[in-house]
Amino acid sequence: MATVPTRSGSPRQLTTKQTGDAWEAQARRWLEGKGLRFIAANVNERGGEIDLIMREGRTTIFVEVRYRRSALYGGAAASVTRSKQHKLLQTARLWLARHNGSFDTVDCRFDVVAFTGNEVEWIKDAFNDHS
């Protein structure tokens, strides 16, 4: 778990949620620096959450952000399991339907931004509704 110094100088532990929010904010800034436009963050639909929704041209991008301190056990990218992919697909499907769209009518893709230690990896089109 990451730590942050307090005003008194002694570190305090961040919650898992705070750590995740910090990495998601960093991923958002990083993607915006690459030219993507922010749409939404922490989108909850029945049974799942999408960390970031971005836009690149006419493409809607659903982004999963992952952080791991080290590359042990495959690093951050390897933690996006088949089960997690399925949940993300379902959540995106519900979000699209809420916004009058579907995988058939909206150009979209699923990206992963993986932070492993000090390294960042952007996996474009990491998976899709046909995988």
From Swiss-Prot:
Gene3D superfamilies hit by this protein: 3.40.1350.10
Disulfide bridge map: none
Polar residues: compositionally biased ranges: 1-19
One of the record's GO molecular function terms: nucleic acid binding
Annotated region (Disordered), positions in chain: 1-21
Transmembrane segments: none
Pfam families, A to Z: UPF0102
Family annotation (InterPro entries): Restrct_endonuc-II-like, tRNA_endonuc-like_dom_sf, UPF0102_YraN-like
Entry similarity comment: Belongs to the UPF0102 family.
Record protein name field: UPF0102 protein YraN
Organism (species): Escherichia coli (strain K12)
